Amino acid sequence: VQQSLKLAFGENSAHVADGSIAAVQSLSGTGSCRLMAEFQRRFMPGCKVYITVPTWSNHHNIWRDAGCEQDTFRYYKESTRGLDFEGMVEDIQNAPDGSMFLLHACAHNPTGVDPSAEQWREISKVMKAKNHFAFFDMAYQGFASGDCERDAQAIRIFVEDGHKVALAQSFAKNM
């Protein structure tokens, strides 16, 4: 598990070094997401999860089966075949304070469209101001850019900005 933490948070991460990250092994991405959904239901009652439009279809099933309330937020803009950054930020700002957002760390499934580092910083800033919780699903580290470090930038930006985050890290597709 320690090597997985280093891959996600960085070889020289202070949080990895000081042991302040809790980590458990589960059954791939689906199992990790289900574990987070169960955690949310039990320890974050009343907290709605916001899921990108579109998303991997199992995300909705996992949170539904765990009994969690869910909603969606804009992500992909069909007309440009790119990120709907303005719509995404607007939806994050309009969500009730303390909501949870399921974010794809890289290689968004199914679009493959990812925010730039600058856009991730803005998303982090808006989420911090609203006291939102970020849950990252990272199934494709190394596939988006060909660089595992670059593909982990979203998570690292949020941690650097002082967020407490959760991460579902899977190696089913990149090993």
Model-identified regions with their sequence ranges:
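Active-site PLP-lysine loop of aminotransferase-like
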Residues: 107, 140, 159-175
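Active-site glycine-centered loops adjacent to acidic/histidine catalytic or metal-binding residues
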Residues: 137
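Conserved core of the PLP fold type I
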Residues: 1-131, 142-143, 148-160
